[in-house]
């Protein structure tokens, strides 16, 4: 019993304390009523001196409170202005208009009703909410959102709500909701915040009568003829830009004001509807007094935007004139009880800040207004604002967007879609804005200062969500501004969609003839207009063909996933050139890196220099000779056992070394070494010559200078390394395996270093493009940089310059397919489809669907692009080199492959070629050929598995007629998906038993095959191996660019600068991390990591749409974490092998295993793999 009484006492004390605290809170915090009207302009109130509108209650509030006679909305359109009021932000920030989706949650989380609701206020709303937002429950304790009913084209637009079964005008309905709200909540312990939004005096646009008022105001102005509008002469209309003359401002003028009868009806209706609101305000104030809360209830009255009442022969709002942006604003705080009129410019977004200040709630830092409470309480005479930003940014066909600034004396504005259309007014001397001073010499400095201020305020009030597209490309070329000539007269454009926009729903692309024109947002060469498309790569130029030799500028803007328009990108310059041969793919510029020594030593008068890495380069140095003499310069790729430049590289090898003489003399201080050209790699019509303007180049890392009579220091010497355009930051990789990290660095650098010659070449020995070399080079180039030009030009080169190996011809389809998948561009497919059909070798097939090179004749060689009289026949190669190559006693790189007329390697490539050709035929709309190539692929797969597979051993033999089984005969079917699932285990077991029994070229397909079937551990073992047949061996023997072979012993004429040895540069992103395009151009990315024994890894992979970033952490045997960031305008599918018995958790939510993959949208994702997480 005692316990029971104690509990009762505690409850009583708690209730009493809570009530006492609530009453204290209520006493400290006022009730707030914010009344918003629709289209009520600044002078449509009696207190402003208007004799025709009857607003006694508004006038009384103005007389008793603070009246702001220069209140301005930051944007003169109801939807955007209301969004500004809710969020406290300029339109430029919240970016909401009639055609967008919801206001961003990030902004609505800081909306003033939610802020007050979360800080002890009871919040209510009735009327026109005016913006799209689906969670009003989070803002209001009670609410009803409604507006004019646009289903009705008559008075029912305003008359469809009922009170006690009587249909009433919306103004009356809203007023009654306010009265009922006060009746229920005035005596509550919580203070209340009531937001009322009247639809009046907005016209009902769909109805011929336009304006509908209540009978209570019907008698007003009955016997009055209202005076006509100011600036009614047609010259004021004709002074408007064409877009305004053709737009909604003019159209709505014809609805309301274009004859005296319409004008009188509309203007009287407008005033009567305002008077109807005034009657409701009277009832509301009476109810406050009745409930005894009138002394502690602040009332704010404001219009959402201004309005044209026939001035300039216009109606509506939207423009930057004062008629459109100025509104009435009254703040009546009965606790102050001091009337004042304030002429300072104040904004709608100040009201948001003022409401928070009245409630004693700290305003979010993101809000952009200023509290007016210090002015209302007369604690200050100014809020210190000299210039305001005004804007109407909704890009709508019938209303031209504009932006400007206003001071007490000046107004400047311009039209967004043509910034050359500007207006400047001295509003102090010319308040009606009649005399446009723009272009007048006397006011040039004023206009310039205001333009700069506008740009400053635009930048200040733009946040991350305004960011425009970036990383612009023309013909897939980044930064084409200088040293690049675009060959396509109708080029394709591309850009990266900002991550803040997530997806693109539309774009507008401008091409202009000058920087001035593009900066004014004019596309005098081509304006795409708004194109409803998500395409952000390979966007075709749609104008007349561009002119050779001319320079152009372009930029683009997009609409995001919610149809919000963001800013234009920065403009990009490009120049049209002309190809000097049949190749149409634009060549990118070359870059020369000036590299200082990483080691510089004076060794008994011989200067030894280590530049850290080998490069295709020359060398320059500063030297001050006092007398003429000769310096001996040695450069090379190797050092000897004593750490000096190796003057005798291995016999037969193509490891480079040169000794050069440089004559020096007084008066000359800068010298370049005279590198000697090599006869073989400069053969006319065989080797690819260096680009025009290049000096002779040699791959070298080390140098020595002997014979110097004056001192030389490290800063005097530079290695000039030549390569194509390269972004080092485009890709990256790290893991907990140091060997793997070194292999990645070696491979990535190899791709950069070997791009010196304009096309992919096979190394310095020959400097000739080969199809297989190029394919491996391309894959690694595409996964290490967002650079496609060299690969595309090399593909075109092969169309007329084929090489002799059978499989190399089959690599051309692989090259084109990789380019298509990584870029999404079909230009080369369209141009070379017919020639590619020949290179796929489908004409060599037998009735079973297998091909043989023995069928090749001279006529077919011509089809492949070989010149008339070419002697060497098409020959199967499998791998390179063969046994006993070049006089050596080595087994070669073919694992003992036994050549047969019909062999497994050739037909594995053929199967892949047929699949690719079917896809290309589909792209080109060649339906019959799609079926033909699909059938050929199916027949080839069936025949290979029936005629080249040893069922007893469960492995593939080298060809029909032999029982020998090589690594190559088994890794190729694995790489191309030929192996039936029931035979994968035996094939994999055999492959693993052979080790790295293939060349650095074959390693591409070995790793592809292993990752295709989930052999992650073994693939990782190969990548991070330290054996003699490994990439680490290349590092160990001293090279910084990948070798042509695993070691000199396996190919005695090898060079130390062969990109086909850089397979890990693509195997790590494509295999270990499993990041590939699932659809062309990375519209959908596939991410299927196979980390094997790694404990941690992070990677950046470039794509045509932006970089994919990923991190892996092995937290322990029961938990792994992947963090993935997907760029804008891309989706990805993330999957893992063997997730049975494990939980996949995406951003905290468990993913049903049946889905098989996690769908990733643009942005950051955390994916956890947990074992038995229950």
Curated annotation (Swiss-Prot):
Entry function:
Bifunctional enzyme containing sulfatase and alpha-L-rhamnosidase activities involved in ulvan degradation. Ulvan is the main polysaccharide component of the Ulvales (green seaweed) cell wall. It is composed of disaccharide building blocks comprising 3-sulfated rhamnose (Rha3S) linked to D-glucuronic acid (GlcA), L-iduronic acid (IduA), or D-xylose (Xyl). The sulfatase specifically desulfates L-rhamnose at the 3-position and can act on the motif Rha3S-Xyl-Rha3S in an exolytic mode of action, producing Rha-Xyl-Rha3S.
Bound cofactor: record note: Binds 1 Ca(2+) ion per subunit.
Location of the region described as Alpha-L-rhamnosidase in the Swiss-Prot/TrEMBL record: 569-1174
A GO cellular component term found in this entry reads: periplasmic space
Where is it localised? Periplasm
Protein's recorded name: Bifunctional sulfatase/alpha-L-rhamnosidase
What GO annotations for molecular function exist for this entry? Answer: alpha-L-rhamnosidase activity; metal ion binding
Q: Which cofactor does it need?
A: Ca(2+)
The EC number on file is 3.1.6.-, 3.2.1.40
Reactions this protein catalyses: Hydrolysis of terminal non-reducing alpha-L-rhamnose residues in alpha-L-rhamnosides
Determine if Hydrolase is one of this entry's keywords: yes
Q: Which residues carry this modification: 3-oxoalanine (Cys)?
A: 78
GO process annotations (BP): carbohydrate metabolic process
Induction pattern: By ulvan and rhamnose.
- Record PANTHER family: ALPHA-RHAMNOSIDASE (EUROFUNG) (PTHR33307)
Q: Which UniProt keywords apply?
A: Calcium, Hydrolase, Metal-binding, Periplasm, Signal
Extract the ranges annotated as region (Ulvan-active sulfatase): 22-568
Q: Where does alpha-L-rhamnose bind?
A: 764-766, 1058
Q: How is it modified after translation?
A: The conversion to 3-oxoalanine (also known as C-formylglycine, FGly), of a serine or cysteine residue in prokaryotes and of a cysteine residue in eukaryotes, is critical for catalytic activity. This post-translational modification is severely defective in multiple sulfatase deficiency (MSD).
Specify the species.
Answer: Formosa agariphila (strain DSM 15362 / KCTC 12365 / LMG 23005 / KMM 3901 / M-2Alg 35-1)
């Amino acid at each position: 019993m005692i316990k029971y009484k104690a509990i009762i006492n505690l409850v009583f004390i708690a209730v009493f304390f809570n009530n006492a605290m609530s009453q204290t809170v209520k006493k400290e915090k006022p009730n707030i009523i914010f009344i918003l009207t629709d289209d009520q302009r600044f002078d449509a109130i009696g207190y402003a001196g208007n004799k025709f509108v009857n607003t006694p209650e508004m006038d009384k509030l103005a007389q008793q409170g603070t009246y702001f006679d220069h209140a301005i909305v930051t944007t003169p359109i109801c939807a955007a202005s209301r969004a500004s009021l809710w969020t406290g932000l300029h339109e430029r920030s919240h970016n909401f208009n009639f055609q967008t989706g919801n206001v961003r949650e990030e902004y609505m989380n800081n909306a003033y009703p939610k802020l007050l609701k979360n800080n002890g206020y009871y919040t209510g709303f009735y009327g026109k909410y005016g913006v799209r937002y689906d969670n009003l429950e989070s803002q209001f304790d009670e609410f009803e959102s409604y507006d004019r009913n646009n289903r009705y084209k008559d008075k029912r637009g305003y008359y469809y709500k009922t009170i006690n079964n009587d249909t009433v005008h919306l103004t009356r309905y809203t007023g009654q909701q306010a009265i009922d709200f006060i009746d229920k909540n005035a005596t509550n312990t919580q203070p209340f915040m009531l937001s009322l939004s009247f639809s009046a005096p907005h016209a009902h646009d769909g109805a011929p009568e336009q304006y509908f008022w209540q009978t209570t105001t019907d008698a007003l102005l009955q016997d009055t003829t209202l005076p006509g509008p100011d600036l009614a002469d047609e010259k004021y209309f004709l002074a408007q830009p064409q877009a305004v003359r053709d737009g909604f401002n003019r159209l709505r003028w014809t609805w309301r004001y274009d004859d005296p009868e319409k004008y009188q009806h509309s203007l009287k209706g407008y005033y009567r509807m305002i008077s109807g609101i005034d009657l409701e305000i009277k009832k509301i104030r009476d109810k406050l007094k009745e409930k005894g809360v009138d002394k502690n209830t602040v009332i704010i009255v404001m219009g959402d935007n201004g309005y044209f009442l026939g001035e300039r022969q216009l109606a509506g709002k939207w423009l930057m004139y004062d008629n459109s942006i100025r509104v009435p604003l009254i703040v009546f705080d009965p606790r102050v009880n001091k009337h004042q009129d304030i002429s300072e410019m104040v904004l709608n977004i100040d009201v948001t800040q003022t409401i928070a200040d009245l409630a004693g709630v700290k305003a979010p830092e993101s809000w952009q207004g200023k509290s007016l409470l210090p002015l209302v309480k007369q604690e200050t005479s100014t809020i210190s604002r000299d210039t305001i930003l005004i804007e109407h940014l909704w890009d709508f066909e019938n209303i031209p967007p504009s932006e400007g600034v206003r001071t007490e004396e000046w107004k400047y504005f311009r039209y967004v879609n043509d910034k050359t259309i500007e207006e400047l007014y001295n509003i102090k001397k010319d308040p009606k804005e009649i005399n446009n001073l723009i272009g007048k010499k006397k006011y040039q400095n004023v206009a310039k200062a205001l333009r700069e201020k506008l740009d400053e305020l635009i930048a200040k009030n733009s946040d991350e969500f305004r960011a425009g597209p970036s990383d612009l490309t023309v013909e897939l070329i980044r930064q084409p501004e200088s040293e690049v000539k675009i060959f396509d007269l109708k080029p394709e454009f591309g850009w990266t969609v900002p991550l803040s926009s997530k997806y693109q729903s539309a774009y507008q692309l401008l091409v202009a003839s000058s920087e001035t024109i593009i900066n004014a947002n004019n596309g005098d060469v081509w304006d795409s207009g708004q194109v409803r498309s998500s395409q952000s790569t390979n966007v075709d130029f749609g104008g007349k063909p561009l002119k050779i030799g001319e320079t152009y500028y372009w930029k683009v803007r997009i609409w995001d996933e919610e149809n919000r328009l963001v800013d234009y990108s920065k403009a990009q310059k490009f120049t049209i050139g002309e190809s000097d041969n049949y190749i149409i793919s634009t060549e990118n510029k070359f870059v020369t890196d000036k590299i200082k020594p990483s080691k510089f030593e004076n060794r008994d008068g011989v200067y030894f220099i280590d530049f850290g890495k080998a490069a295709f380069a020359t060398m320059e140095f500063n030297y001050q000779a006092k007398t003429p003499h000769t310096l001996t310069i040695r450069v090379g790729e190797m050092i000897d056992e004593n750490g000096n430049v190796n003057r005798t590289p291995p016999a037969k090898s193509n490891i480079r070394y040169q000794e050069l003489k440089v004559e020096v003399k007084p008066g000359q201080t800068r010298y370049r070494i005279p590198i000697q050209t090599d006869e073989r790699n400069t053969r006319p019509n065989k080797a690819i010559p260096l680009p025009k303007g290049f000096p002779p180049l040699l791959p070298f890392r080390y140098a020595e200078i002997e014979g110097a009579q004056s001192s030389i220091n490290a800063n005097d010497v530079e290695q000039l390394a030549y390569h194509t355009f390269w972004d080092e930051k485009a890709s990256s990789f790290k893991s907990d395996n140091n060997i793997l990290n070194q292999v990645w660095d070696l491979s990535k650098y190899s791709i950069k270093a070997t791009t010196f010659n304009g096309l992919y070449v096979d190394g310095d020995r020959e400097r000739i493009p080969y199809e297989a070399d190029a394919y491996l080079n391309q894959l690694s180039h595409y996964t290490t940089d967002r650079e496609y030009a060299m690969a595309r030009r090399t593909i075109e080169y092969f169309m007329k310059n084929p090489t002799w190996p059978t499989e190399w011809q089959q690599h051309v389809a692989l090259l084109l397919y990789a380019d298509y998948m990584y870029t999404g561009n079909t230009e080369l497919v369209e141009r070379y489809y017919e020639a590619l059909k020949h290179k796929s070798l489908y004409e060599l097939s037998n009735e079973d669907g297998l091909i043989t090179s023995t069928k090749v004749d001279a006529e077919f060689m011509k089809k492949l692009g070989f010149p008339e009289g070419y002697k060497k026949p098409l020959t199967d190669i499998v791998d390179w080199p063969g046994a006993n190559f070049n006089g050596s006693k080595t087994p070669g790189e073919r694992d003992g492959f036994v050549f047969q007329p019909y062999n497994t390697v050739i037909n594995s490539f053929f199967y892949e070629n047929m699949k690719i050709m079917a896809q290309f035929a589909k792209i080109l709309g060649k339906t019959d050929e799609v079926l033909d190539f699909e059938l050929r692929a199916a027949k080839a797969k069936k025949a290979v598995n029936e005629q080249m597979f040893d069922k007893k051993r469960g492995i593939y033999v080298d060809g029909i007629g032999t029982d020998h089984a090589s690594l190559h005969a088994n890794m190729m079917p694995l790489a191309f998906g030929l192996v039936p699932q029931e035979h994968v285990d035996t094939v994999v077991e055999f492959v693993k038993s052979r080790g790295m029994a293939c060349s650095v070229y074959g390693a591409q397909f070995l790793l592809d095959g292993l990752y295709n079937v989930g052999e992650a551990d073994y693939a990782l073992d190969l990548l991070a191996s330290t054996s003699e047949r490994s990439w680490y061996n290349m590092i160990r023997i001293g090279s910084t660019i990948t070798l042509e072979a695993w070691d000199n012993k396996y190919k005695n004429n090898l060079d130390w600068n062969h990109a086909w040895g850089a397979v890990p540069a693509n195997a790590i992103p494509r295999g270990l991390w499993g990041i590939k395009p699932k659809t062309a151009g990375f519209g959908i990315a596939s991410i299927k990591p196979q980390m094997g024994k790694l404990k941690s890894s992070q990677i950046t992979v470039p794509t045509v749409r932006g970089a994919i970033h990923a991190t892996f952490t092995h937290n322990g045997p029961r938990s792994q974490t992947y963090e993935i960031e997907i760029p804008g305008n891309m989706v990805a599918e993330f999957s893992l092998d063997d997730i049975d018995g494990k939980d996949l958790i995406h951003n905290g939510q468990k993913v049903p295993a049946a889905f098989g993959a996690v769908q990733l949208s643009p942005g950051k994702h955390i994916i956890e793999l947990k074992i038995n997480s229950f």
